Amino acid sequence: MPKVSVIMPCYNEEKCIARAIESLVDDYVMKHGEILVIDGLSSDRTVDIVTDFIKRDFPIKLLKNDKKLQCFGLNQGILAAKGEIIVRVDAHSSYAEGYVKKLVELLERTQAANVGGVMRPKGHTPVQQAIALAMQHPIGVGNAKFHLGNYKGFVDTVYLGAFRKEIFDTIGLFDTNCRTNEDAELNIRILKSGGKIYLDSSIYVDYHPRDSFKKLAIQYFHYGRGRAYTTVKHRQFTSYRQVAPPLLLMGLVGSLLLSLFNPLFLVFWGCYILALLAASLFTWSKRNISLKIRVLTGIAFMVMHTGWGAGFLVFFILPTRKHPKTRSGATLKKINHEK
């Protein structure tokens, strides 16, 4: 079996990282793998927790990411990795039994350049539960198959992913101008190089959402900004879900301003709110979900839409010192499928 390096960038994940590590480490990882935890100068107990695992002889190496951002941590982990295969993971999640082994087998079976499973958001508080529901609904996430599940086949992106290490010599490392959206940007380069991306929904990750709407808004603002950067860099839209939030936000702001002259323009707001309420109140009619959580889900939809849209638009409105480049770290070459 090929040696595997599991790359886990993190920052202040004391609440989640133990659960993430425990769910990843099994007989396969103990025999054939290593886990590289790249810490972005955490100020909580994250480092202490990881150090405790190392003392208990878990196959873990702890690296320090002085630049803090996730993209730098990912690249640092890839360069330090000893494995032939890189499995990219998130400290904010927990993983299905045999997760790493299943991805390695899927990578070899499909001969894809990147393989992954689906994200299953799991909330604990009412706000988290609402956000989790919003992240599993087309109104919240569009047609992204790794969110919606029940799909096996080739796609344009997956959640997290697994790669052969050699691919980074072909397409370059993660783009360090991407504070977020670095996964999607890398996947665009994979597709441009002739590689394929495969999703298997039987492989899943339990993702722990943000625990407040403020944190969700910040998260989606960065998502939108990152997607705008990727759109400019590659001069392409990969799906309608990229332009829907900024267009919606412009419509909401525009109709609000125009309503100062004619109240009829508020009809746009009314239709939007009714659509959110309908989605949150009636979509999961057969599930035992409280009215409170359903209403909170409607709020989560709005926060995700406006946060993402604002980030996308701000990228174009405010000047940036960093200009998108064609690649990151290597000359973009065609992937050799005959290896």
Segments the model singles out, each with a brief description of its role:
Residues 107, 175-238:
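Catalytic donor/gating beta->alpha subdomain of glycosyltransferases that bind UDP-sugars
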Residues 23, 39-48, 67, 90-96:
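A conserved acidic beta->alpha catalytic loop
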Residues 97-129, 133, 208:
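Conserved donor NDP-sugar-binding/catalytic core segment of glycosyltransferases
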Residues 22-32:
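Short, acidic, metal-binding catalytic loop of nucleotide-sugar glycosyltransferases
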Residues 65-81, 102, 154-158:
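Glycine-rich, basic loop-to-helix element that forms the pyrophosphate-binding segment
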Residues 86:
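Short aromatic/hydrophobic "clamp" motif used to bind/position activated sugar donors
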Residues 117-123, 132-160, 169, 233:
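Short, flexible, basic/aromatic active-site loop/helix in glycosyltransferases
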Residues 3-5, 34, 185:
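Cell-envelope/extracellular polymer assembly enzymes that use nucleotide-activated donors
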